[in-house]
Amino acid sequence: TVLSEAMKFWKRIDGYGKILPTILTVTKGFTMKEYFNIGTIPYKGIDSNDPFSFRHYNPDEVIAGKRMRDHLRFSLTYWHTLCADGTDMFGVGTMDKRFDGNDPMEIARHRVYACFELMNKLGIDYFCFHDKDIAPEGNSLFEFQKNLDEIVPLIKEQMQKHHKKLLWGTANLFGNPRYVHGAGTSCNADVYAYAAAQIKKAIDITIGLGGEGYV
């Protein structure tokens, strides 16, 4: 395939060229605990030439009475990091973010594990999401909320296991064609009600996961 040929090309390049094939290496099955074939990214200081290291960001260094990680609350964005497939306006997806899942719910579960693994390796304490980032919409509001109810406990379990926090949650009120005229501004009462139900569910999930804000 074109992607496999591109991977072979990147593997022949030294330095930063090694990053792409490394990041795209994923493992199969839920019994495998590692999705990204990289180690934890350490702080090595300004003189480091290691592309897999921090040169300026030292998370536990205290500045003005607070650790860097408390001043700079970096957050993993679920949609860009775990869902976006690299599509641009004139092309198709170039990144496979299914993590070897075979159906939408299996993919959603894989993404949860991949999320917390990557947060650990990058030293990120927070994450954030839209509702449809973490679970598939399905064919109805009932199915969407059922899918969320299955995935959210897994997220909570992983948060507790890895000591991570939710910075904020929100509802995606733009990705589905039903929102062609907006959500709260829609001229269709059914669309308005659907949006309200999405928001209510997303707020409940955010509160349940101890989110620090709702967007």
Please provide the spans of the model-predicted regions.
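Short, positively charged and aromatic/hydrophobic N-terminal segments
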Residues: K8-K11, K18-K28
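N-terminal pre-domain/capping segments
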Residues: T27-G213
